């Protein structure tokens, strides 16, 4: 009898706005939930003799920055994330947006999306 194992959560996160308490809370919560889900799936897959390797979180950034202190909480969560986080600048990555961009485990950008510190 074949066992159907659950699939992981969606991994695309978006920051198309100013950095503020609300936007940082959304991203922080999403990263924590994905990490919790991946930890559960690793254990569940192991019970069935299958190795579970989580796919990276893709965080798309288009932000002119904003509240630095609220940003620090997200940066800490990103740093401790067991699931790799790939940050991609799609438009602007300025001020806090730049700090988020460089905190990704891997960093990417489109050719017409220069970051600004």
What are these regions (language model features)?
Residues 1-117:
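Terminal-region recognition feature
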């Amino acid at each position: 009898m074949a066992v159907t194992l659950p699939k992981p959560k969606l991994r695309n996160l978006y920051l198309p706005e100013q950095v503020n308490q609300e936007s940082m809370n959304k991203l922080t919560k999403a990263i924590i939930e994905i990490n919790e889900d991946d930890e559960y799936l690793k254990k569940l897959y192991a019970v069935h003799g299958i190795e579970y390797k989580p796919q990276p979180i893709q965080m798309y950034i288009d932000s002119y920055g904003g509240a630095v202190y609220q940003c620090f909480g997200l940066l800490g969560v990103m740093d401790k994330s067991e699931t790799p986080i790939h940050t991609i600048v799609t438009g602007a990555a300025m001020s806090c947006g730049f700090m988020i961009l460089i905190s990704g485990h891997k960093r990417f950008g489109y050719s017409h999306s220069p970051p600004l510190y």
